[in-house]
Regions:
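Mg2+-dependent endonuclease catalytic cores in nucleic-acid-processing enzymes, primarily RNase H-like
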Residues: 1-92, 114, 124
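Charge-patterned, long linear interaction tracts outside catalytic cores
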Residues: 94-126
């Protein structure tokens, strides 16, 4: 519940930090704000944001804490959809084993956006 989420954020000492939440639940974000987590904000999702976020994550070697067992399960089972006629994998992620991965993508979205800005700024032709 949103009440439990708010309490968990508070108990971990993150109530004053920026928290990025799934933007598909604006009412939940509003409720969590009312519960004192004022810096919660919706994730910005654009065209192909899932695919772009996954490709961004794939650039890095991830080190997963042993206690993060569910996240490890998701990473090990994350898969791509198959073309129904050919059976070949297509460049579309399946909508399974992805809740933790989605949260991870949201947490990195600002870093990814800032990196793109730096690349655009330094790649101008003068």
């Amino acid at each position: 519940s949103n009440k439990e989420i708010s309490k968990m954020i508070e108990s971990k000492g993150y109530s004053k930090e920026v928290v990025t939440a799934d933007s598909s639940e604006p009412k939940s974000i509003d409720e969590i704000k009312r519960r004192g987590i004022f810096r919660i904000r919706p994730a910005r999702k654009g065209k192909d944001s899932i695919l772009n976020g996954i490709q961004f994550i794939q650039q890095f070697k991830l080190v997963i804490h042993p206690n993060c067992t569910q996240f490890r399960v998701e990473l090990e089972n994350y898969t791509w959809k198959k073309d129904k006629s050919t059976g070949e994998y297509i460049n579309v992620p399946s909508d399974t084993y992805n809740h933790g991965i989605d949260a991870f993508r949201y947490s990195l979205s600002e870093i990814q956006r800032n990196m793109k800005k730096k690349i655009r700024a330094t790649s101008r032709i003068y």
